[in-house]
Amino acid sequence: MSLQMVTVGHNIALIQPGFSLMNFDGQVFFFGQKGWPKRSCPTGVFHFDIKQNHLKLKPAIFSKDSCYLPPLRYPATCSYKGSIDSDKHQYIIHGGKTPNNELSDKIYIMSVACKNNKKVTFRCTEKDLVGDVPEPRYGHSIDVVYSRGKSMGVLFGGRSYMPSTQRTTEKWNSVADCLPHVFLIDFEFGCATSYILPELQDGLSFHVSIARNDTVYILGGHSLASNIRPANLYRIRVDLPLGTPAVNCTVLPGGISVSSAILTQTNNDEFVIVGGYQLENQKRMVCSLVSLGDNTIEISEMETPDWTSDIKHSKIWFGSNMGNGTIFLGIPGDNKQAMSEAFYFYTLRCSEEDLSEDQKIVSNSQTSTEDPGDSTPFEDSEEFCFSAEATSFDGDDEFDTYNEDDEDDESVTGYWITCCPTCDVDINTWVPFYSTELNKPAMIYCSHGDGHWVHAQCMDLEERTLIHLSEGSNKYYCNEHVQIARALQTPKRNPPLQKPPMKSLHKKGSGKVLTPAKKSFLRRLFD
């Protein structure tokens, strides 16, 4: 095993415990950013590009017919194929937490709409469920099983908020284990069915799940009610005949006590479990090798990585599976130093000696993953789980190398110029100021003379003013040239005020005109 430190560009603030990674044809995409998406990347999905131990997050594109996909932390995700032999990969996303700490009960299906010049356009659709709809939750698992030429989703575990009748102001965000029900979900028709299995007595969350053909293995996990991490090992088998599906569960010996572990696949039938927690305040520093057979599973300890002192002394850690036996790890930065980063990141290669040369290039230059996940401090009740499919690994997949020249080189662009004598924008210390900014400062064009660009923040522009100027066609002048521009302008001619004529105060109004008939009547009246 080899451990390498990874540096991150300006988007490091987007990475937080609970994010997910999705792999589409060798390209990995980041999902679950911190906070709500900005205007510069309204989708909240980024290309997760690692080259020479440096990570860049580049905004992804969605088709016009896509639904809105909110950033979700600790969702259950898995890759999905219509059949076990299909080459078309989709990703299923269920549950998770929004930036407002609301829990989602929706199912989203992510797929590739088109791919042009290595630029991927996604399509996201929301699937409505009927039947026994799972309650909103996070920290659970979802896997896909294949039986008799059909496929079905298997959802289990997780945590949810207390029932509305029990939630109070003081305990509004208190969570509890979901009931230990197993849900079968038909992604084609949107039907969900709940199964109660006697072998599953306690609710679990942040466990490890592995799917192989018609079987799902559940390892470890944490029970919030008893605050223990039992050495669980369950085998859930699903049979899909023409009629009603058959679901059975078997308790197997030889489990491990772990929660929030990271799972990566090193071979068709071999997985490595890294990280997680074995006690409330104790990280699990050993690694386990999981070998799957037709009806068997074996778990054994393997070589322990040469952890750095920062990782050893860190109270929490989190990460995700990058694929090809590589794991992405993160630990909190040192808050004692003024210029310390929020997090430090590493890549851990678990099976470098078994990879081909092409796969080694993939591990060095481009992250890859079959299934996502993350962890976070257990004392904050924020753990995560991972799931993987034994049939999803393909060591011979061709990787389409990403062309760095397709992107703009930020070092030669004019974003980091000194726009005015009081400009203090520096590439090393700059942080986003406007909601429209992501990794570059917002600029506006000054129309004085031949014209030049200035930073909107240096001009003290309000965000609504900046948006108004960018949408319209009015000329803008910077603070240094605005007085010169005003002096050169010809003042507009103001038309004279038109005063309404005043009525004469002594003018008598016109009297009433009496007709001859009325005059004759009045004469006879007074005579």
UniProtKB/Swiss-Prot annotation:
It comes from the Eukaryota. Changing D406A: Reduced interaction with histones. InterPro entries: Gal_Oxase/kelch_b-propeller, Kelch-typ_b-propeller, RAG2, RAG2_PHD, Znf_FYVE_PHD. Changing E407A: Reduced interaction with histones. Residues 361-370 have a biased composition (Polar residues). PANTHER family: V D J RECOMBINATION-ACTIVATING PROTEIN 2, V(D)J RECOMBINATION-ACTIVATING PROTEIN 2. This is V(D)J recombination-activating protein 2. It comes from Mus musculus. The gene is Rag2.
